[in-house]
Amino acid sequence: MARLCTHTESGHYLMALDAGTGSVRAVIFDLQGKQIAVGQAEWQHLAVPDVPGSMEFDLAKNWQLACQCIRQALQKAAIPATAIAAVSACSMRESIVIYDSNGEPIWACANVDARAAHEVSELKELHDNTFEEEVYRCSGQTLALSAIPRLLWLAHHRPDIYHRASTVTMISDWMAFMLSGELAVDPSNAGTTGLLDLVTRNWKRSLLQMAGLRSDILSPVKETGTLLGHISQKAAEQCDLQAGTPVIVGGGDVQLGCLGLGVVRPAQTAVLGGTFWQQVVNLPAPVTDPNMNVRINPHVIPGMVQTESISFFTGLTMRWFRDAFCAEEKLIAERLGIDAYSLLEDMASRVPPGAYGVMPIFSDVMRFKRWYHAAPSFINLSIDPEKCNKATLFRALEENAAIVSACNLQQIAAFSGVQADSLVFAGGGSKGKLWSQILADVTGLTVHVPVVKEATALGCAIAAGVGVGIWPSLAETGEKLVRWDREHKPNPENFAVYQQAREKWQAVYQDQRALVDGGLTTSLWKAPGL
């Protein structure tokens, strides 16, 4: 039997495994929350020939990459495996893994898998076209990203897998299973399947039964920060961790990211600026939006939920603009030894608020029930090169990202009654000082920017530490470990300018959506089933 190691005996560090959409990381932290070492590897998801929208998760290869990252992190930290007090895992949400009756993982898909568009449409017609509303009222999710249509797709197209299915989990749970041999899900990540009751934080089996699907494939539910099991001898040999090291239940990347940012109390608000931007508000009790515009997820803090709105491709749009139009600025930035975005922000800071009326049309506000966007474009350009140039367009894009965030926060306040009095801005976008100030000016809220801007792994490490008794609770530890880099106060004059810009943009965006509806332009993105 493997000997159990405890933090009081030898462990002075915690390991977080972070399975993102594009990469996997193993991150080691000390007991003060300082990052010590990281091992990282990119991974690619698999498009299946003749299956439009498919994006399968390569279980065998990706486990090898995870083990590689663990070994790399241990080597970089120059510590023995016995120094790791506990391990926990977090991941992109919506991704599911299916296991057979022997506990072998047999199929998985990534969060971006969109193969089940026909099944989404089929499910929406159930119960006199009310099934999706029933799913949303219970779980806070629509069918767009739910596991239900994916399972139905398997029943229709891969019955060999569907009939062998014994258990379903999320990617974070799969990583923990590969380490420990124990299967369970946590509410924060499993909540994104559309099968978890927000009130009970447990499965709602009747939703599967209503869809004509099996309800006997749901894993046990355990809360984030509780003991799942211990590193098995097999896993120890694969990844060089110490057999017997505790494996602690992790969770969804956004919720654990909020834990790492100290966003753990009711009404606290965060804007997470990455490839997608998420606007997250903590609610003290489960409640859903009557208009079904935003999703509601279980927080990792028991009893609390998070409203979450999503701005589509915000970070990706900025990267597209930089790469497509700013080759000169990239060269200059390289010579100066600075980031190209910093140079572009410096140029944009000389453009007045409002960007001379230029209106970017990219992501819409979130409309979860009928989720699609207008065709990408810039509206209200001029041919005056002094006013309409790269600096102006770059500033307009930063302003627009903040405007969409403000609109999404307004939607949340309208149905929940929870109004933010400040917000935390994290993720890659928060590195921009101009962008942070614009966000403050557009929302009218004080913006706090943390030192650790990518906090998901830290939140995961906090879960690991709480699970072995190093820290007393998730919320208390999240508040204790977060450190602040800077603060941005809103400028009242700029706020007034942006209020007018927001109203104009909302009106113009509706006209642009109508062009998509008429088949005249192509949407930036549409949810499956539309």
UniProtKB/Swiss-Prot annotation:
Principal location class: cytoplasm
UniProt GO cellular component terms: cytoplasm
Keyword Cell cycle recorded: no
Reaction catalysed by this enzyme: (S)-4,5-dihydroxypentane-2,3-dione + ATP = (2S)-2-hydroxy-3,4-dioxopentyl phosphate + ADP + H(+)
Gene label: lsrK
Full protein name: Autoinducer-2 kinase
NCBIfam families: PRK10939.1 (NF008187)
Keywords on record: Cytoplasm, Kinase, Transferase
Disulphide-bridged cysteine pairs: none
Protein purpose: Catalyzes the phosphorylation of autoinducer-2 (AI-2) to phospho-AI-2, which subsequently inactivates the transcriptional regulator LsrR and leads to the transcription of the lsr operon. Phosphorylates the ring-open form of (S)-4,5-dihydroxypentane-2,3-dione (DPD), which is the precursor to all AI-2 signaling molecules, at the C5 position.
Gene Ontology molecular functions: autoinducer-2 kinase activity
Documented EC number(s): 2.7.1.189
Pfam families, A to Z: FGGY_C (PF02782), FGGY_N (PF00370)
Subcellular location per the Swiss-Prot or TrEMBL entry: Cytoplasm
Gene3D superfamilies on file: 3.30.420.40
Annotated InterPro entries: AI-2_kinase, ATPase_NBD, Carb_kinase_FGGY, FGGY_C, FGGY_Carb_Kinase, FGGY_N
Any one of the GO BP annotations: quorum sensing
Family, as annotated: Belongs to the FGGY kinase family.
